[in-house]
Amino acid sequence: MANKFRTLDDVDVKGKRVLLRVDLNVPMENGRVTDATRLERVAPTITELADKGGKVILLAHFGRPKGRDAKESLKPVTEALSKVLNKPVAFADDCIGEPAATAVAALKDGDILCLENTRFHKEEEKNDPAFVAELAKLGDIWVNDAFSAAHRAHASTEGLGHKLPAYAGRTMQAELDALEKALGSPTKPVIAIIGGAKVSTKIDLLENLVSKVDALVIGGGMANTFLHAQGVGIGKSLAEKDLAPTALRIIEKAEAANCAIILPVDATVAYHFAANAPSHAYGLDAIPADGMILDVGPQSVARVHAAIDDAATLVWNGPLGAFEMQPFDRGTVAAAKHAAERTKAKKLISIAGGGDTVAALNQAHVAGDFTYVSTAGGAFLEWMEGKPLPGVEVLRIK
């Protein structure tokens, strides 16, 4: 995979103005960054470019502003980034025009500058050619290190790749290498664990995966829709009953592709959707009519463990139960710990992505033991759905 993209190994950046697209979309409260994970992810690329004598010019969006909005300024994020890098980071209060040009002109080799939120200009999301040209004036090369925004064809995430020599940053490179290991040319057998509440948001994903993986574990609220489609009484559980025909179609498609579908065989049921609500495990033939399935049961967990043991590669998106409330995190935490153990024993390549998935792995204290954890939400999902990502396609060596 790496040889299909130009990386930082292919360019001498000394003295060059490097427009570096990064993901600085971090959570903030009262003007302070509350989680610096994304800043830590981009630090290696920024540091490498600066250490090699490049003039590093950061492009990023923040939030979804409608025009200029002080609450969506990147200035406080720049201050947090400076702490993570342990280097000064200059700031320009616009990403184009005179403020940007003046700040860029002042840079010496190895300096770092962050330009203001690209989304303060509506032309960013329209990928407007005149806006792209304004941005391109500020740089000699463009490096895309924001895989999490690669599913959007915006000016700073895609348009610049047509105007300037384009390269993948180290975060982007790591993500593309991991995804290639996951589904591009994986070590077989491959298992996917797909959870979360709704089938409706993951139809494309499931339909793509059944032709790519050897086994597909379906958990979370999604599994209730599949169980209902197969005639299992699910009580008052969350389900999209109108999608029963879709669920059956996916099962048929899996059978035709020789992909084993692994659904729960028992369930943890409670009568209230609340933390520490009294709960009990039931077989599928005995789910109480007024109960709610909130997690997979112990027999299902054992089946998931066995499926992981049979696999060489695991791709995971979505929790197996209502993991944000104890004790309904048990199934997800147990499976995550099991996958982490197999990974540490060098028996499994494990790749996980999506917001809830990352939160669940952190809750199980195993995120660091997985082969790769993607912080990209939408881009990770669209890639798993088999869709081309504009911000990646533009990096391919033509």
UniProtKB/Swiss-Prot annotation:
Complex and partners: Monomer.
GO terms (BP aspect): gluconeogenesis; glycolytic process
Name of this protein: Phosphoglycerate kinase
EC number assigned by the record: 2.7.2.3
Catalytic activity: (2R)-3-phosphoglycerate + ATP = (2R)-3-phospho-glyceroyl phosphate + ADP
UniProtKB keywords: ATP-binding, Cytoplasm, Glycolysis, Kinase, Nucleotide-binding, Transferase
Principal location listed in the UniProt entry: cytoplasm
Cellular compartment(s): Cytoplasm
Binding site for substrate: 23-25, 38, 61-64, 119, 152
Similarity comment: Belongs to the phosphoglycerate kinase family.
